[in-house]
Swiss-Prot record:
InterPro entries, per database record: PbH1, Pectin_lyas_fold, Pectin_lyase_fold/virulence, Peptidase_G2, RHGA/B-epi-like_pectate_lyase
Ligand binding (Mg(2+)): 285, 310, 312
Its biological purpose: Structural component of the 12 appendages that hang from the lower collar. Adhesion protein that binds to the host cell surface during virus attachment and mediates teichoic acids degradation.
Species in which this protein is naturally found: Bacillus phage phi29
Keywords: ATP-binding, Degradation of host cell envelope components during virus entry, Host-virus interaction, Late protein, Magnesium, Metal-binding, Nucleotide-binding, Repeat, Viral attachment to host adhesion receptor, Viral attachment to host cell, Viral tail fiber protein, Viral tail protein, Virion, Virus entry into host cell
Domain remark in the UniProt entry: The N-terminus has three domains that function to attach the appendages to the phage, digest the cell wall teichoic acids, and bind irreversibly to the host. The C-terminus is an autochaperone that aids trimerization.
Gene name per UniProt: 12
GO cellular component: virus tail, fiber
Name of this chain's protein: Pre-neck appendage protein
């Protein structure tokens, strides 16, 4: 007996016909094709069938050869004739044709009715057990328990709302309508397409949600690999519409940072819809490598944390593209519970949220308060092209939670690039439109446009305090009547950059400021404000015309530079400049550097500020060695003492402290601030014609003596001189030098020796400078207000030497001497009259002459 031939083509016949049918025949009914294109598709389809038929004929000939060689011809003929007479052969042909038409194995082939009444669960189970692709035709197919999906399942329907799979009213609690067979370790290679899953939650009564874990969703995929879900509608769900999760019926809570074993992965959800759900429409847990695109989730049954799309505990590497949500608590919520790892590395490429409470809500529960541990997993969300339309909470979700366009809590590494928020009813959202809060950090909001939120407190608010956000970049924002404060930064926020903010506030209810920050150290630039009373309010100070603030190392208009400290700057300079320490800078200079804090070099070259609080201006080759040293227009010079200033000099080196020096190649003058002394190498001249030397004297009677009177001494005080008395001087207004003013303190403020010399003590300043300081007098009261002699009526400037204007009578002659009568000069033997400048008149009672007093 010959060996029975292997009929490989017969074994694959059903699968091949299905593939050909799926690929070619439906195009004949595609109205987007022209008639010529339709005909070409059909002809190509028939040609492919012909190829398969030829191969089948070749294998059938092998069968016939085997039958004939082994003498089985009579048996085969007899069997075929009996099948034909009994109708079995005809039924077989009809069944094959029907299954081909229904795209694989139809559930009706296995007895399904699809009449909305009959329990079709066994038909589904048998069809799936056949191993062939299963087709669900038009109809409502009732099932009394969940449908299990083994590996390598293909289940395709006649379309959403055409092919409906629905729970019967008799189904109890805990069942999911459709789920993979092995809920612990999972299955693989599952394809679901084109039907509706109706959870019939109404059978359980009003307000019923899931009993716990991942049970009671319309579609549950647990621990599966390679799952494609397309054109599925999930309605009236007890828990979720579609749930992608790890193995097991209960969601694991293993602590932050610990993901569950057996994740689902390589999941594709496309063009699906969820509505009437009790928790979330489409959700993921502890799974990875998931794509969700072109889906619509809307109008949940309940008002708890019911989100259109929820990427939950332990989910990672998830991409959501061009989806839409409506009427949910969260349009997209990316989150985790406190004892589970947060969803991370999530990408959103386009989403439209319509009338959700919080269109985009990113949070890690249990990690928001200042006393909570910092989340280790809430990281990496990138979202672009987000749209939020009329966010509101008319239904009272989450105990009347406040609406938001976007809320970020506890996450770090969040990038938003393109977010549009719009409302035509400003009363729907009256608090904050976009918030970064509750320990969120390292977030970037770029390309944000908000329109119509004219009753809201804040357009964008980085909430401060002990659990505030931090490290936030806000850029390229357009605010159209949105927020009394356009961008608001709370207290304690140390790292914020706000750039290119444009706001129109003339339609806002009581606008305050386009940008407002509690702290004084944000980075701010590029503000454009219309209709706001002030463009920027920083640390309580208003800047009506805008403000530019930068933090960190700063270099501008500079070809190249060396090291710049984070609190240093170099501007308008050429190569070789450094500002390597904090609070230092180099401006319009070359080859210059600051080496100590709080130092500045400007308009200089090859100079160095080595000490703290150094300043070098307009100098070449200048060096400031110690603190509080300065060189201004001083080249090739060195200031080596504390509080030392060199002005307009060349080639001098100074030591000592609290001094001002100048010179050329040597020191030519010095102001000693420590001791109040002035030194000059050459002549000291006056800048006017004043020509006498004077001292302060007190009048004997305490009254004013007018200018030009000759005075004498009595009891150490002055009065008008009389004839024959010793004239000491003249009351003068032209003294070039005046001594004894006691300008700064009471003359008895310090102790003096018997000769009037000051008694000193040696002290050391806080910066280490040693010097001699006058000993304070125990009789001196520093709390008393001191009035200098120049402001007291009893004290007078008396010219003692020089050319002084004197009151004269009619006897005085040029070239003669003078005497005094009642303080008025008369002809005598004292001094010399140089010139009579105002002749004597009886009306005035005196004249004026210039007298050389010596």
């Amino acid at each position: 007996m010959s060996t029975k031939p292997e009929l490989k083509r017969f074994e694959q016949f059903g699968e091949m016909m299905v593939q050909l049918y799926e690929r070619y025949l439906p195009t004949a009914f595609d109205e987007s094709l022209t008639l010529l294109e339709k005909m070409n598709k059909i002809i190509h389809y028939l040609n492919e069938i012909g190829k398969v038929t030829n191969e089948l004929i070749e294998e059938w000939n092998k069968v016939m050869e085997w039958i004939l060689n082994d003498g089985l011809e009579d048996l085969v003929k007899e069997t075929l004739e009996r099948w034909y007479e009994e109708g079995k052969f005809a039924d077989l042909v009809i069944q094959v044709i029907d299954e081909l038409k229904q795209f694989g194995v139809s559930v009706k082939t296995y007895g399904a009715k699809g009449d909305g009444v009959t329990d079709d669960i066994r038909a589904f189970e048998k069809a799936i057990e056949s191993g062939f692709p299963v087709y669900v035709p038009y109809g409502t197919f009732m099932v009394s328990r969940g449908i299990k999906l083994p590996s390598n399942t293909v289940l395709t329907g006649a379309g959403k709302r055409n092919a409906v799979i629905k729970f019967m009213d008799s189904v109890g609690r805990g069942e999911s309508l459709m789920y993979n067979q092995n809920v612990t370790t999972g299955n693989e290679n599952i394809f679901l397409s084109s039907f509706t899953l109706d959870g019939n939650n109404k059978r359980l009564g009003q307000g019923i949600s899931g009993i716990g874990g991942s049970r009671e969703s319309n579609l549950s995929i647990r621990a599966c690999h390679n799952v494609y879900i397309r054109d599925i509608e999930a309605v009236d769900c007890t828990l979720h519409g579609i749930d992608i999760t790890c193995g097991g019926l209960d969601y694991p809570y293993l602590g932050d940072g610990t993901t569950a074993p057996n994740p689902s992965e390589n999941i594709w959800i496309e063009n699906c819809e969820a509505t009437g759900f009790g928790d979330d429409g489409i959700t993921t847990h502890h799974s990875q490598y998931i794509n969700i695109l072109n889906c619509y989730s809307h109008d949940p049954r309940l008002t708890a944390n019911c989100n259109g799309f929820e990427i939950d505990d332990g989910s990672r590497h998830v991409v959501l593209s061009n989806n839409r949500s409506k009427g949910c608590y969260g349009g997209i919520e990316i989150k985790a519970h406190g004892d589970a790892p947060a969803a991370y590395n999530i990408s959103i490429n386009g989403h439209m949220s319509v009338e959700d409470v919080r269109s985009y809500n990113f949070r890690h529960i249990g990690h928001h308060a200042a006393t909570d541990p910092q989340s280790v997993s809430a990281k990496n969300i990138v979202a672009s092209n987000l749209v939020s339309i009329r966010p509101n909470n008319k239904r009272g979700f989450q105990d009347n939670a406040t609406p938001r366009v976007l809320a970020v809590s506890a996450y770090y590494g969040v990038v938003i690039n393109g977010l549009t928020g719009y409302t035509d009813d400003p009363n729907l959202l009256t608090e904050t439109v976009v918030s970064v809060q509750f320990r969120a950090r390292n977030c970037s909001l770029n390309g944000v446009g908000l329109t119509g939120f004219s009753n809201s407190d804040n357009g964008i608010y980085v909430i401060g305090g002990s659990r505030g956000g931090d490290a936030v970049n806000i850029s390229n924002v357009t605010l159209n009547n949105s927020g009394r404060y356009g961008v608001s930064i709370g207290s304690g926020i140390e790292n914020v950059s706000i750039t290119n903010i444009s706001g129109i506030g003339d339609g806002i209810n009581s606008p305050v400021a386009l940008v407002s920050t509690i702290n004084s150290n944000p980075e701010i630039s590029g503000l454009s404000s219309i209709g706001y009373p002030t463009a920027a309010r920083v640390a309580g100070t208003d800047y009506n015309d805008g403000l530019t603030l930068f933090n960190g190392a700063f270099r501008a208009s500079t070809t190249s530079s060396g090291k710049i400290h984070s609190e240093g700057f170099i501007m308008g300079s050429t190569s070789g400049c450094e500002a390597s320490v904090s609070k230092s800078g180099v401006l319009t200079s070359s080859s210059s550097k600051t080496s100590s804090e709080r130092s500045l070099i400007a308009g200089s070259s090859t100079s160095e500020a080595k000490g703290t609080y150094n300043t070098i201006l307009g100098s070449l080759g200048a060096v400031a060695d110690e603190q509080f040293a300065a060189l201004i227009s001083a080249s090739q010079s060195r200031a080596s003492g504390n509080h030392n200033l060199i002005l307009s000099s060349y080639g001098i080196n100074t030591t000592g402290s609290y001094k001002v020096n100048g010179g050329f190649e040597k020191i030519n003058w010095e102001l000693d601030s420590l001791n109040g002394r002035i030194k000059a190498r050459d002549t000291v001249t006056g800048g006017n014609t004043w020509s006498d030397f004077a001292e302060y004297f007190e009048s004997l009677d305490g009254q004013v003596i007018e200018t030009g009177y000759l005075v004498t001494l009595e009891k150490g005080k002055i009065r008008k001189a009389e004839k024959g008395e010793k004239i000491i001087g003249v009351i003068s207004e032209t003294a070039g030098f005046v001594l004894g003013e006691s300008s700064f303190e009471w003359q008895g403020a310090v102790l003096k020796n018997e000769f009037g010399g000051i008694i000193y003590e040696e002290v050391t300043t806080e910066d280490g400078v040693k010097f001699k300081r006058p000993l304070p007098s125990p009789d001196f009261d520093p709390n008393k207000n001191y009035i200098p002699r120049s402001q007291r009526r009893e004290w007078h400037v008396v010219g003692l030497l020089g050319q002084i204007a004197v009151r004269i009578d009619e006897t005085v002659k040029q070239g003669h001497g003078i005497d005094a009568v009642g303080g008025v000069a008369t002809d005598g033997d004292n001094f010399i009259v140089q010139e009579i400048t105002t002749p004597y008149t009886k009306e005035k009672g005196y004249g004026v002459a210039i007298v050389l007093v010596k």
